[in-house]
Amino acid sequence: NIEFVSANPTGPMHVGHSRGAIFGDVLANLLIFNGNQVTKEYYINDYGNQIINFAESVFYRLKEIKYKEKFPNRVNLYPGDYVIDIAKNILTGHPKIDLNNFQKIFKLLSEESLKHSMNLIKADLKALGMSHDNFVSEKSLVEKKLVETAIENLKEKNFVTEGYLNPPKGEENKDWKKTKRLIFKSTLFEDDTD
């Protein structure tokens, strides 16, 4: 598998995503041309804070459209016009949506927002002449506990250890806190450090 692009599904692609998309697609095509079996994969980062913030942005756009409430000026929200389009689509499909409680409609908002956003991304990829064989959802991996299973497999093979990492090089480290974490033993595979 070659996983490439994998832009967060919180809006349309930008030039930076396109660069990675082109590089990944060319690499995959070169490998295929040389007789390798390749699966082109897109990892959908649809789990975590960014998705919560994205759904919340749509929530506030819905309130703006339906009740003329001002969209909040918060750094964690997505202010783009595409969020307005998503909100309008949701209102078309769910005209009686209850906007009194974000938590109650989070699942609907996140699913509809992700679907809309992934359609934009797939259209952009198609315009670049690219297609992926697999689209893998992070959320589905988490819900199926595949990450925990992988970690257990690594532990059984003694490929991981608990330990501490040094602060990142070349960065201000005033906020760095040494915390115990699971570390992959990459030195077993001739890397310089774990």
Whereabouts are the PLM-identified features?
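NTP-dependent nucleotidyl-transfer catalytic core
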Residues: N1-D194
